[in-house]
Amino acid sequence: MTVGILALQGDFREHEEMLRRIGAPTLQVRLPKHLQHVERLIIPGGESTTIGKLLAMYGLIDPLRARIRDGMPVWGTCAGAILLAQRIADGRADQPSLRLMDVTARRNAFGSQLESFEVDLPVLGLGDEPLRMVFIRAPVLEDLGRDVTPLAHLDDGRVVAARQGTMLATCFHPELTPDERMHRYFLAM
């Protein structure tokens, strides 16, 4: 099972390294033709506006939507979660995006890069041991649709991980920690 990693901008190399460490073959996805060689896809963190523009520039939006609608598992981390969200709060209405997951992503929910933080929280489906979560200019997920399952909440109740069918969104960066559980969870979806 080859895991595609959208490699237009952002921290795709960190995801690639984590997947290699756990033995999963990877392919950097930059063009629509690359999608035919992958069974699942990670959309990494980075800058959601920039990644969205690059998705449009390289003709990836429609092929990605089609593959995801056909059931290809996809995981968006941070900016990737924003790009998966049907609705984007605090974003531009014309921002290129996939708009597939029935959630609202609130961009930069914690403020600037100076307000970045780490916290240990439980994640549904990962066992009892809390997961180290790294938040960097991170969004939160709001207005979850009926078919969306929240997987992790901050202490104040805000949702920072959710799943809808074969779509997974995390507002934090599991690839920046040594913990493999989120990547293994995605591979098992």
From Swiss-Prot:
Record's keyword annotation contains Aminoacyl-tRNA synthetase: no
Residues given in the record as L-glutamine binding sites: 46-48, 107, 136-137
InterPro entries on file: Class_I_gatase-like, PdxT/SNO, PdxT/SNO_CS
GO biological process annotation, one example: pyridoxal phosphate biosynthetic process
Catalytic activity: aldehydo-D-ribose 5-phosphate + D-glyceraldehyde 3-phosphate + L-glutamine = pyridoxal 5'-phosphate + L-glutamate + phosphate + 3 H2O + H(+); L-glutamine + H2O = L-glutamate + NH4(+)
One Pfam family from the record: SNO
Recorded metabolic or biological pathway in which this protein acts: Cofactor biosynthesis; pyridoxal 5'-phosphate biosynthesis
Keywords: Glutamine amidotransferase, Hydrolase, Lyase, Pyridoxal phosphate
SUPFAM superfamilies assigned: Class I glutamine amidotransferase-like (SSF52317)
PROSITE patterns, per database record: PDXT_SNO_1 (PS01236), PDXT_SNO_2 (PS51130)
GO-annotated cellular components: cytosol; glutaminase complex
Enzyme Commission (EC) number: 4.3.3.6, 3.5.1.2
Role of this protein: Catalyzes the hydrolysis of glutamine to glutamate and ammonia as part of the biosynthesis of pyridoxal 5'-phosphate. The resulting ammonia molecule is channeled to the active site of PdxS.
UniProt protein name: Pyridoxal 5'-phosphate synthase subunit PdxT
Source lineage: Bacteria, Bacillati, Chloroflexota, Chloroflexia, Chloroflexales
Name of encoding gene: pdxT
